[in-house]
Design a protein with these regions (language model features):
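Hydrophobic alpha-helical segments of small multi-pass membrane proteins
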Residues: 91-97, 113-120, 131-135
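Internal alpha-helical transmembrane segments of multi-pass membrane proteins
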Residues: 82-106
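Alpha-helical transmembrane segments and their membrane-interface boundaries
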Residues: 1-68, 72, 76, 80-89, ...
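Generic transmembrane alpha-helix signature in multi-pass membrane proteins
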Residues: 74-78, 111-118
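Non-transmembrane, interaction-prone segments in cytosolic or luminal domains
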Residues: 46, 109-112
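Mid-sequence acidic-hydrophobic segments that form the walls
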Residues: 96-101, 117, 142, 146
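Membrane-helix interface "capping/anchor" motifs
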Residues: 53-62, 100-110
Length: 156
């Protein structure tokens, strides 16, 4: 009976998501850069890896490259135009375009160009925490889904 309750999908997804975000927060706290490492789009990525692990949008490849491609589109637009209503839209549109043509669509990453542009300066939006965070989330997803839960989950 207890095993059935623990492995009830909403409970399992909630516990797994809480664990992933808590570990990211612990890593952030340990490096004394709490805010830098806690990127809001990570929350939505964790929803996909824990609640919808069979979705193609939750593949490690999509998580990693989707976030990096989207952030890069934000950096590109922040570099060549003054932040405005249209630069936000164009950056998100570019992110979607490049994620789709590379088969790396990851909807949570669509928020990254907005974060980059609204940060006020591309220097203020550090790509390192994003890269480390998405690698951590992807490794967590593989360990959770493929190794612990024995799901048919891609390595990459």
């Amino acid at each position: 009976m207890i095993k059935k309750i623990i492995f009830y999908p909403p409970i399992l997804a909630s516990i797994a998501a809480a664990g992933c975000i808590s570990l990211l927060a612990l890593m952030s706290d340990a490096t004394s850069t709490f805010i830098l490492w806690m990127i809001p789009t990570f929350g939505a990525s964790v929803v996909l890896i824990t609640a919808l692990p069979n979705s193609p949008l939750a593949r490690p490849k999509n998580i990693i490259f989707g976030h990096l491609i989207s952030a890069a589109s934000g950096v590109l637009l922040a570099t060549i135009v003054i932040p405005s209503f249209y630069s936000l839209g164009i950056a998100v549109g570019l992110a979607i375009f490049f994620m789709m043509i590379t088969d790396c669509l990851h909807p949570p990453a669509g928020g990254n160009p907005i974060l980059v542009i609204l940060s006020g300066s591309i220097l203020e939006f550090n790509l390192l925490p994003l890269a480390v965070g998405v690698l951590f989330i992807s490794i967590y997803a593989v360990i959770l889904n493929k190794i612990i839960l024995k799901r048919d989950y891609p390595w990459f």
